[in-house]
Amino acid sequence: MSGGRQRTLPEAWRRAAGPALQAGRDADGNDDDDDELLAAAAAELDPDPNPNVDPNPGPGPEAAAGGFCAAAGALWIYPTNRPERPYQLRMARAALFANTLLCLPTGLGKTFVAAVVMYNFYRWFPSGKVLFLAPTKALVAQQMEACAQLMGIPGRDMAEMTGGTQALSRRELWASRRVFFLTPQIMVNDLSRGTCPAVEVKCLVVDEAHKALGNHAYCQVVKELSRYTTQFRVLALTATPGSDTKAVQQVVSNLLIAQIELCSEDSPEIQPYSHERQVEKIVVPLGEELGGIQRAYIHVLETFAGRLIKLGVLARRDVPSLTKYQIILARDQYRKNPSPQNVGMQPGIIEGDFALCISLYHGYELLQQMGVRSLFIYLCGIMDGSKGLTRTKNELGRNEDFMRLYQQLTDMFSDTCQTSANGNLHKSRTVSENKKEFIYSHPKLKKLEEIVIEHFKSRKMGCSDQTTSGGTCVDTRVMIFSSFRDSVQEIAEMLSRFSPVVRVMTFVGHSTGKSTKGFTQKEQLEVVKRFREGGYNTLVSTCVGEEGLDIGEVDLIICFDAQKSPIRLVQRMGRTGRQRQGRVVVILAEGREERTYNQSQSNRRSIQKAISGNKMLHFYQHSPRMIPEGINPELHRMFITAEKYKPNDSGRLPKGRPSSLHHKSALFSCVTDPKEMHCHENWSLSPEEFEIWDRLYRLKENDGVKEPILPHTRFETLENLDKTSKPEEEAAHKLSLSEWSIWQSRPFPTSMVDHSDRCYHFISVMELIEVMRQEQGDCSYELELQPHLRIEDIHVRRNKGHLSTTSSAFAQKTHSSKRDMARTKRPFVPDVNDNEREFFSIFKTTNTKTPRTAPGLDLEEPELPTDTNGSEPCSARRLTLVASTDQGSPKEEEIEKVTFDLNEFNDLCDDGESTVAHESAAVKDLRLLDKHCSSVGLNHTDLGYSSFTAEKSPASSDLFYLPESHVDSFVLVSSSAELAGLEGAFSCVKGLLAHSPPPVSKLEGIEELLRHEETLCPLPKVSCRSYSGQLPHGDFPSSLAVDQSLLPAESPELEVTIGLSAAVNTCVSKPASTPTAAGGAEERPPGGGSFHSLLGKEGFTANHTDNPPNKHFVQGDEEDSEMKRDVTIDGEKSIHLFEDEHTYKVNDEMPSVDVEPLLRLGSGGHTARPSAGPASQQPPSGDSPRGDTACGEGAARGEMAPGGAWGRGSAAEQALHNSELCDYSQELFSVNFDLGFSIEECEEEIFEGDTDAMNTPKLNSASRSRADVQLTANRKSLNDGCRVQTPPKWDCKGLKGRNISTPLPLQSGHVRDTAVPGGTAGGRTGRGSPGASPPSPATPTGRRVSSAEATRRIRKKVFSTVREETPEVCPTDKVNPNSQRNSFGSSASDALHTTGGRTENLEGTNLHTSRVFPAEGTSSESEEEIVFQRKNRRNNVLRSPDVGSDSDFGSPVCAVRKRRHPLTVSDVSSDDGVDFHKNPNRGTRGCSAAGSKAQLRGVKRQKVRSKVTCKNAARQFLDEEAELSQQDESCVSSDETEDTDKELSSSLAQFLNDDAEVTQVLNDSEMRGVYLKSVRSPALGSRYRMVHREFNSTEIFSQIPEQDEAYAEDSFCVAEGDEETCNKSESSEEEEVCVNFDLLNNESFGGGGGRYLTRRRKKLHGANMEQNCSAPVQKKPSRIIVLSDSSGEETNVSNEKGTAAHCSRAGRENAELLTSMPSVSSVPHKKSAGDVSAHQSAESKSGMLLGLKASVSEVLDFHPGPRSGSGKEALQAAAQHLQLESSVKNSAGNAPGATKASPALLDGDTALCVLVDSREISSGADVISSLKAVHGLKVQVCSLGSGDYVVSNRMAVERKFQSELLSSVNRTKVTQRLQRLQGMFERVCVIVEKDRTRPGETSRFSQRTQHYDATLAALLQAGIRVLFSSCQEETAVLLKELALLEQRKNAAICVPTEVEGHKQEMLNFYLSLPNISYLAALNMCHHFSSVRTMVNSSPSDIAAGARVSLQRAEETYRYLRYGFDTQMLPESLCAKGKSNTATRS
């Protein structure tokens, strides 16, 4: 109530008279009866908050009749605020007591009657709902406004609901409102969804009721409501009940009409209230010109229609007399009963001719009614192909007559075709030109123009006669109706020539076509509003203007065409004659159009006669009275003052608000107020709105509002940055930074505009603060920062030669901090667009002027040595320029401050969000510095990155670089070495900043863990003098922000990178022999410092030979190195820098050391990278030591000094450091990747463990953590050997939850003696990138490792990765004799690291003690010793104690035989990562060899030649792809899996195993097992030998019927593609099994042949094994992918107990292995898996991608699980616990968590529940309503995405009409849909339903087609159940039966089907996962408390939570851990994805 004004009269009564009335009632009852009645009515009308409670009970409570209020029902109120009309009063009274069809001509008050009825039902039923249905949104809004103004229903009780209202909002509205205005479709949806309380509906008003024909939404609403209740009133409103009596009867029946209230235009009742309508019919002859074109067109028609007439499919009649409708009927008849005489013809030809004739006849109708132009536009659409009628176009193009006619029309309208198409109403020509040029395409147009002009002339003359000359001219309005938009456009164009007298506007409906643009609802409303208010005086409209819309009074209506339906004519005529005399002119063309009009008039009269007589209509006889017997409401007239209507829906345009149409081009160009047009140029407010805002809302000085300011802040650790503070202003209001902190740690929902990146940064900072606040004891973040916030790091050495160190040192250190791992802790980065001032103010630089002023730089320029300037890019100097001087001038200090902050900024930006899109203001300042550099004449010649910025990385957008304008001046480079260094650094930097760090959540226990590791492995100090001279770039962190995606893989200039320098630091390097390479290297420890920082202060006691200054950096670093190295390890740095480069190009000569740094480092095409994904290429330099980049400086271009050699200590220490970090010190691994610096000078053995550390995690750790990497190097040997650094990011991340205490004891201390000359780059450079071939691991040369002890503690993971990644022998690999053997047990390390916390005591694993490493000088073959069983050496493969790597399978060339060597586990990491990662089609056999390697007693060290070409690198897993297609040993042959342990010989002679002589004893099944065994791959006993062609696994798997068990068991068609790929693409059809290769141990015949394990023997053997379950495992499990067969067989559940290694995939498991790990629980497995997932969203480093893969593989292949004899048995367990039925058979594997079905899932309502897809609302409404109303099922309508119905956790039902299957048109769509269903559900059922017969049609038997039968057969063959139904009700019965069946099998839906709040968001996330059905997502919502819980769950838990098979759970598990590289995204998504995903993780 505004201003105290009464809202309604009853409200006033209620307030004033209510209490007195009650008192009087209680006492004497003196009040007047009328007053009592009024008071009762007022009490009901009182807008009480709770309408259900009657505040004034009155004479009695609500009656029994559905909540009827007796007090209110005593009377019915008729408003008197409008003049009373008797016919309205009569109709309102009638409509209150029976269902009524109200027929009134337009403009005579139908809406008023409806408002009265609605208002009274609103009073009578306080808890009831009143509905008003209107067919369009515009009508809904209009009627709502009308009812509110007429009857005063409170706005808070009304709601408008259209398609724009969200379902959740509607649910709330249904619960809180009582009067609804909505479209019928929304009503149907809400009834089907159960949102609308159907039983509460008391009154239903239907507008435009004549539409209620057939299956219209009106009919569905009434039918659905009547299923629940009959107690509701129906009031139908229409001006024209139907086009004929049959249609009227249908309306009456559908709407349950009991009576009709009809007033025709001739009725005496309405005559006083309707003005005369003068209807004129004008018939226009066609004319000669149009007649000629018509004759030519008929000639064309005869040609094509004649074809059909000849074939007898079209009636023989006069061609011009045919109509489009007649041809359509003929086509339908032909389809139903094809003529026998046309059997030989292709039906497609006849169909095509029908379509052609229909198109031509439509054009003929256009020609006759609309004219030549409309015909031409239509034909243009056909001939230019826009209408898609290709055949029609071709046929017409071959017809000479047509082309002649078409050319004639083209010449006539050549200039107008375009005009019409673009919808422009106006041309820039003068009126006279337009008049001359306009072509009247039809004589009717001329007549129309005459009528309109005449009307305005006469009106103008009439105006001039009156006193108000000119004032009333605007009042006249003309409306023109035409059926087609082209005609509308033409008419408007014609009339627009008479502007301004005629102000014309078009009015059309919503756009449905491709070319024509319609009006939106807002545009329509705006047009109507302007027309009503006089903005336009002429409106040209299509039929959309005929109905409903209140367009005001129209004086002249012109119908440009006739309509056959009398309804439309009446509707058109109703637009006029409402308030004054109106005129209707119908312009008709001579001929057919005239006949059509006459016919419609005749129909109209007959309809009115039939209705008024009520003789022919059958009415509904059971209309409810709604009012209880004995109550007869009396009429009470009341004046109602309605409250001012305020539309509360955003869909409505508030009055006075300028429409968005102002922006629309040419829409309102004719009549637009200039003042309004320009209001949007500068604001979003119009001048009027601005004035209101300025007056009411603008804050002024006298308002007392103080200006808000931020409080002064400071860094505790950076006190010196802020020395001055400004005095506080009195008028300012100091904001509190902590007051709102509780809301600032998470993003709040947004609408339209998302949070900014800065906001997300801030939120992450607040999250960090919140985490720190809750910490107890030491602050982990403080510990992280402590090593980085040292003054030594901030203030650069004042040595002119060492300018570059400050920034890089700090940046790199900060970079490696834990914050990088946890993106949530990252502070915000200033936005790119922020100005410099803002950035510096944020970072508390007191003076921002200096960085921008050239003079400041000029002062210091003289102190910058030229060589420094030359060797450093200006961008590097930006930060450190001033800092290099010794004297600290104020300017210098200021710049230093900036420098520090920029370093910090760089740290902040280093990852995902500091991509190209996030260039900050700091960068701008840097650019300014650069400008100043150039302006003051600094020497820029050596700016080595010019080519990089300008040419190589188009995406860089000069982020952290000079703009392109600056690049040219830097083109010259003083030395190639420096150039390489710079570019390398830049590339690293870019990579470093391209990715986001992992979330904090996974780092909880890391510090304690790290400290523990440090104590375990104290880090010896190593002196290292690094060549930083070439890496000045390392000094400017700003350059670190380069996006990795910008690094061209081929760019040779990028070889040397910061990571490189970091790596270089790890080794003591000798002075570069070339001055250019030195570049001040010896004098620049700062460069070393930068490396130093990269390495996280590895504790290098500086070798300050040439470098005293280095001391400065080392000091203090070493003190903290023990504590901090964990966080700031080179690896981490490298990770950041080279995020995606986990695939390194393989160079034969690239020694592998610290893989990541180098590998990543060499992002440009580094030899260090075995492969760089698709873009990676072999290093251009071939064997040239491009790997020298690893060496850092001089080696960047192969310029390394020949005499340079690496010191042993540093590399060893590095490796040691890694081991310390992860406690891998006792594990033996060979480095099969480059460690990031060239080991060329390092004489130590390089451990590839780091590679594994860096890479394996990709594969084996669910998180990208490298922590899992186990370095196998013994600490002692490491001291002398090359120290491998595990990137902290990896190491630390994965540490959580992983028992890092399982180092592999490295027994040999001989590592140190291997020497790697700088010139040779070891072949193995690390796991290739996903998509690139992994290089073969090179084993360290000259090493002997002694005993099985080495592998005693190898984690089980070791083997997981080992087999996955065993490299193949590449015959092409050649290594220089002196090349370092860098592949050192990486596979083991990978595997170890993958263990994620489980340590296996492999004590009994008879590992070969003779671990021999080939001498260093041996040839590549001998060096790379691949250990495989000699092909003919031993016949009994199973007995072989040696691990063989059958590289033959991975390599096209036979591998060279080599000596056996102890297992230094081969390079798992590189292979895995590559294969599993991005190259789905790569073969993986080589790895499979590795998989079989660590077998039985002697696990041999596998070596591979170091030179691995990209082509062959990924083939290591090829063998692994030949998976055993076996579901169950017990079902097939018990020996099929267990004996695989010894089948390691690569000999082809073993293809058939002759030793098995006992086969006669076996039954058929076991005989088949013998055969299967004989064809297995010798390298992998459980793998079959297959053709070694690479192919996509999907090509094979997709052909395997899901339920063909025999095929799955016998199948040898197994994919050679990469395992992981298979798992991803077709994982639903595979299963992985752990195989114990030692099952047949000690069981052999005298002949040495392997004894086949029969079931009995296996059982006995298993029993023995169970007794020894506590014994350490000696066997290496191997994963086998088994084709999944999800048929319905269910076998007995194995009850064998024992801790089993869980092969997540179901399949065979080694009993010994399973039972031998009592100490290993599934908890660590879950934990490690979880760790990975948490980091996943935060980082997308390529190196990490591999580790992620590794962890996933580990989890899915090697975790403890219930012991089960076979996949089927395991599956059975899972199926039982998941309450699935037998058909799940092989879709699940044994999972530890499968046995724990969540109780939450079992608790649910007992009522049957069915999920229904929302699309079924329209096509299957009866099914839904029958399920609910008839069968009592709970039906939840939701967007299922696939499937129409879900009846249980495992069954989905697709409902198809018979016609869909009869026709082949939709074959592909049906197939795809069913395939998608099979991917989500165990069982799929198709219900084939007969097509619905329309009313009046006779059901016809449809002929079965061949396609129909073939489809049914295919469905059955695919295991899909097919049911048949005759109608929707029968379909509902079938669905109920299916649901009951599934309930009996414990698979029923038993979780709440609706979710709200955050669970809705969870549901949306789960639905985004592939192959997750809606029900599975629901189950997960209710089972897992959060998404995080689900993501961190094991596959078995996911299976139990989602109630899906274990296999699908594993698919989800894999998907969640899929290594995703954001750089693969399009640029538009890349920046957004990086920022949003990282911050929100």
Swiss-Prot record:
InterPro entries: DEAD/DEAH_box_helicase_dom, ERCC4_domain, FANCM-MHF-bd, FANCM/Mph1-like_ID, FANCM_DEXDc, Helicase_ATP-bd, Helicase_C-like, P-loop_NTPase. GO terms for molecular function: 3'-5' DNA helicase activity; ATP binding; ATP hydrolysis activity; DNA binding; nuclease activity; RNA helicase activity. It is an enzyme of class 3 (hydrolase). GO terms for biological process: DNA repair. One of its GO terms (cellular component) is cytoplasm. Residues 1319-1329 have a biased composition (Gly residues). PROSITE patterns: HELICASE_ATP_BIND_1, HELICASE_CTER. It is found in: Nucleus. Residues 447-631 form the Helicase C-terminal domain. Residues 48-60 have a biased composition (Pro residues). It comes from the Eukaryota. Residues 802-814, 1375-1389, 1685-1697 have a biased composition (Polar residues). Residues 1-64, 802-822, 848-874, 1070-1124, 1158-1208, 1301-1403, 1465-1491, 1685-1740 are annotated as: Disordered. Pfam families: DEAD, ERCC4, FANCM-MHF_bd, Helicase_C. Keywords: ATP-binding, DNA damage, DNA repair, DNA-binding, Helicase, Hydrolase, Nucleotide-binding, Nucleus, Phosphoprotein. It catalyses: ATP + H2O = ADP + phosphate + H(+). Residues 91-259 form the Helicase ATP-binding domain. Its EC number is 3.6.4.13. The keyword DNA repair applies. A motif (DEAH box) lies at residues 207-210. The keyword Hydrolase applies. Belongs to the DEAD box helicase family. DEAH subfamily. FANCM sub-subfamily. Component of the Fanconi anemia (FA) core complex. The FA core complex associates with Bloom syndrome (BLM) complex. This supercomplex between FA and BLM complexes has been called BRAFT. This is Fanconi anemia group M protein. It comes from Gallus gallus.
